[in-house]
Amino acid sequence: MQAHADYIAQPQSVASQAARFSTMGVNDLQKAAKAGQAGAQFYLGTHYQYGKDVAKDEKQAFAWFKAAADQGLSPAQLNVGRMYADGIGVKKDESMARKYFEKAASNGDNRASYNLAMMEEQKKNYMGAYQWYELSTRDGMLDNKVISLSEGKKTALAANLTQEQIRTARDRADKWIQAQ
């Protein structure tokens, strides 16, 4: 799934911390990350991901993103899902990718819903794909580019679905949102 290669996500849910961590030097980030601060773990992951002030190391990037993801930081959950999906810094694992995408989607990240939709579409589960594309147009942290892409995908998928299947997919999307 190389569509996931551009996997940097900005930690929108920790905006107050973001400015502080985004400007910290690597040594300070490492101290804060080791102290368990999810925002610092996320930004340290980006340093390793791109080789900014450290040697590029995708395994270290994955480890720090996962530490932040496991504390509930949705942009980190999205990154971990994408890294599992593509086998970047970790062995490729579709079920783990799905797990982390679902966590990020449950936190309202429509980019994660979009990734889940693409996974379903690759499996030719068009109703499931439609459901996730539908969710990606109305999840909490809305990315306008994702909304536009999702609307186009829904239109294309509708050609392969009956009106009843589309209604069912939308109903499932509604139920998924209500369950969150």
What are these regions (language model features)?
Residues R98-K99, S106, R111, E120-E121, ...:
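Alpha-helical protein-protein interaction scaffolds
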Residues M1-A35:
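N-terminal leader/linker segments that initiate helical-solenoid repeat arrays
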Residues Y43-Y50, N79-D86, S113-Q122, S136, ...:
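Hydrophobic face of amphipathic alpha-helices that form TPR/SEL1-like repeat modules
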Residues F21, K34-A38, Y50-K52, D57, ...:
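Short helix-capping/linker turns of helical repeat alpha-solenoids
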Residues K145-Q180:
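Terminal, low-structured helical/coil segments at or just beyond the last alpha-helical repeat
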